[in-house]
Amino acid sequence: YTIYLQKNKMSILIVGTVAFDAIETPFGKTDKIVGGAATYIGLSASFFSNNLKLVSVVGDDFPKEAIKTLEQHNVDTKGLQIKEGEKTFFWSGKYHNDMNTRDTIETQLNVLEKFNPIVPKEYQNCEFLMLGNLMPSVQKKVLDQMRIRPKLIVLDTMNFWMDHFLQDLTEAMKEVDVLTINDEEARQLSGEYSLVKAAKKIQKMGPK
């Protein structure tokens, strides 16, 4: 009963990709499956909160059943844009034995390339903001729309965005509390091999 009450209190705004993935690991391989940062954040967070808000974009090729699954897990999809005649974001990657390092094989931005995120009025009072792995310029646009700063802002990113949109990423990072990246990404972002030195350098970029 106590857990149920706590679960209802926590409001989370989730911004990220709702996408198609093709993933290969040493333990198995998938072709085109439903994936995306926001999809997994939403489903995972549903075990802890009944008050989840989603801001993302998909093409008309994205299965309605997958959207229904999110809604069944108490994810409000009012902020999910569906672009007719366009294709959903697609990412393909190969993970190494340690499951911590990976190679990006293919990235098709598709609808994400011109995505203009709109934070609905009803989403403005969320206590927590989770900026999932997507274009840093989109993450920044969401930050700019927040009238009241959430209690905690978390930003996830990856090497692809560092390679192609580093300036946008550093701008978004100035406004966040927590940055989630792996060892390889921390070294690339900071230019330091030592993870202790990397963390200290990244903290100066914004994350606490």
Spans of features found by a protein language model:
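Short catalytic helix/loop segments, enriched in acidic residues and glycine
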Residues: G28-L43
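A short, N-terminal amphipathic alpha-helix
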Residues: Y40-L52, K201-I202
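Conserved N-terminal subdomain of the carbohydrate kinase-like
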Residues: F20-K32, S49-M130, D144-P150
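Conserved phosphate/ATP/ADP-binding segment of small-molecule kinases
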Residues: R147-P150, W161-K208
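Structural preference for beta-strand elements that scaffold enzyme active sites
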Residues: F128, L152-V154, V178
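Extreme N-terminal starter segment of soluble prokaryotic enzymes
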Residues: K9-L13
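Short beta->alpha connector loops
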Residues: G59-D61, N133-V138, M158-D163
